[in-house]
Amino acid sequence: MSMDSSIPFALLLALLIPILLHVVIRRKYSSYNLPPGSLGFPVIGQTISLLRALHSNTDYQWCQDRIEKYGAVSKMSLFGSPTVLLAGPAANHFVFSNQDLIFTETKAINALVGRSILTLSGEELKQVRGALHGYLRPEMVTKYMRKMDEEVRRHIDLNWVGHKTVTVAPLVRRLAFDIICSVIFGQGVGPIREALAADFETMVKAMLSIPVNIPFTKFNKGLNASRRIRKVLRQIARDMEGALQQGYSSSADDFFTYMLVLRSKGTHSLTVEDIVDNAIVLLAAGYETSSVLITFLIRCLANEPDIFGKITDEQEEIARSKGPNEPLTWDDVSRMKYTWKVALEILRTISPIFGSFRTAIKDIEYRGYHIPKGWQVFHAQSITHLDGKFFNDPIKFDPTRFDNQSLIPPYCFVPFGGGPSMCPGNEFARTETLVAMHYLVRQFRWKLCCEEEGYRKDPLPTPVLGLPIELETRTPPEYGHA
């Protein structure tokens, strides 16, 4: 076969193989009562339309259109895999409590992150989830308060004080990274943290890339950064292990030491490599979600002067009970009730997570439909947040709707998941957010440089310009002890 004739043949083969696979899938599951819907064009399916909706911030409408057409359960094809879309409170309860649905990540994320809680199931998942919940439970978070307080103050002094304008999104991402690096890895200011910061940014950018390991591609750069991060973290973990064996540290000092202590007690059997992988997931999750929340809180306050004033009053009331430069405590954070209601309304109206992917590890039935083993589930968990059946006037920004959270129907407000799948880092994120806002609102007023700036989802909400703001320094009153 000549070169000239082989090229059309290869193109024809490339077109036919996906079509044949598509036909095989249809025949294989002909006896199943599959949900309504269409798998779309082979391989591509509805992937492009979903990505376009995320990028244009019309994902909610994209999902609503499918629900109106097919109902709250429908089949489609996303990222090359047959997929079932689930939405609504009943779906939230079903997905969060179903052990036969495990998290699915892209091939790029699996290669970059490794063997973590995102890819485990069964007994291993229970062990890791239990350990993470233990490390991030409120009693433990109280022990990290001083580190958080120090990191926030240092960050503001270095990056905000003396500046007339700042771009919020990248600064807040770095703040979230520094806090987690200090608390999780025990790494304060220094060259190790700086090296990790640069590599981590590269790795995060590669998580949604095409997983083709060719030099100079985004994925290749991310993979190399991931290897360097692992090398550094493995050494940190071994140093922590040595310090623990010599009695120089305790389980509350950092995540590595905590996990090593649990392993010595037989609570889990994770290797150092496994612990490193889960530490990377903790870093990525906290880095993204907390930074999104703080960024959009700052954006909200620029647009809502009345809310800004109420938050400032609450934070000044807390400051009155403290001495000069006295760090915040858990009790202080617990008193920031109005500030957290505003944060919850941000999470409702601009949810960091629109939806997530899971894989059925066995045949599952939901509402009379079959979800075959190996199929993906795209769980549009936050679509209930903007549903008028559960939230009156859902487009209106109104923190008072959280005055009595018991009035919100179960599984309708799920920014941190729910049931057995509740995010273990929700208290950590809450504390980090409130500490940051305490010091920001007491020291500054701000306004948006571009009032028309929108945001897109890549896949998390991100201001198009990074949220540049003009700063006005405010001298907070000084109080002694009340």
Ranges and model annotations:
Residues 103-113, 120, 143-294, 310, ...:
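Cytochrome P450 heme-thiolate monooxygenase catalytic core
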Residues 33-35, 137-143, 245-248, 330-337, ...:
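Conserved, non-catalytic sequence blocks in retroelement Pol enzymes and Pol-derived host proteins
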Residues 289-312, 427-443:
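Cytochrome P450 catalytic-core helices
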Residues 134, 285, 327-330, 367, ...:
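Cytochrome P450 heme-thiolate "Cys pocket" and heme-binding signature region
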Residues 2-114, 118-123, 127, 142, ...:
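N-terminal membrane-proximal hinge/A-helix region immediately C-terminal to the signal-anchor transmembrane segment
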Residues 100, 379-406:
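Conserved cytochrome P450 K-helix/beta-meander segment immediately N-terminal to the heme-binding cysteine loop
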Residues 50-71, 231, 235, 326-367, ...:
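Conserved cytochrome P450 K-helix E-x-x-R motif and the immediately C-terminal K′/meander segment
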Residues 2-5, 12-18, 35, 67, ...:
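Cytochrome P450 proximal C-terminal region
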